[in-house]
Regions:
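An anion/phosphate-binding loop that grips the pyrophosphate of nucleotide cofactors and donors
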Residues: 49
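Conserved phosphate/ATP/ADP-binding segment of small-molecule kinases
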Residues: 92-168
Length: 195
């Protein structure tokens, strides 16, 4: 109810596959989504929102520039932001982009177990966008990442694991159907930006 009363504007830089469903998830929560990614306006927009989300799912050079500008502007304006490093391990370009964005100090890092393990330097079984590793196997890496970057890390899956590097929480209620529907994780990232 409080979220609906506040109706925060959420700047969602997400991928083409996820835009529609993510916008609808944010709307259903009571927040207001804005799917803005162009470098020409990303920074200006990031300064006036309640939260920013950055998802590298369909990254391109122009989108990457917009992501960096938005993250820098969000930090300058004390706007919290969430990084979703979708399949950062798939290509060298994607990996470099995820590392550059991580260096810009997101408030929250949200990913599946394979993504978090990869960013934390752990070996992973992943090959595409879907997790091949268990949430439990990513917990130590998540705690190390959270401490090293002074952020919250959320490893999502059947049971989510959330940590700031010291405190931990498990969130139950995941569905086995979620991996069968595209953009569920991406939508969760945008929803997190509303809070």
């Amino acid at each position: 109810a409080d979220l609906r009363a506040k109706n925060p504007l959420v700047h969602c830089i997400t991928n083409y596959v996820a835009m529609n469903i993510s916008a609808n998830v944010v709307l259903a929560s009571g927040a207001s989504p804005a799917m803005i990614h162009t470098p020409e306006e990303a920074a200006d927009f990031a300064k006036i929102v309640g939260g920013l989300t950055v998802n590298i799912g369909t990254i391109s050079p122009a989108w990457f520039e917009g992501m960096k500008l938005a993250a820098i502007a969000a930090n300058e304006a004390a706007v919290p932001w969430v990084l979703d490093p979708v399949a950062h391990f798939a290509t060298p370009y994607r990996s470099r982009a995820a590392q550059e964005l991580l260096a810009l100090k997101p408030t929250i890092l949200r990913g599946n177990a394979s993504e978090i393990m990869g960013l934390g330097g752990q070996a992973s079984e992943a090959k595409g966008v879907d997790a091949k590793d268990s949430v439990e196997s990513a917990e130590i890496g998540a705690m190390k990442l959270a401490k090293a970057h002074n952020m919250v890390v959320a490893v999502t899956g059947k049971t989510d694991f959330v940590t700031d590097g010291i405190r931990t929480a498990r969130i139950f209620g995941g569905s086995p159907v979620m991996p069968l529907v595209t953009a569920m994780g991406c939508s969760l990232t945008c929803l997190m930006g509303a809070f």
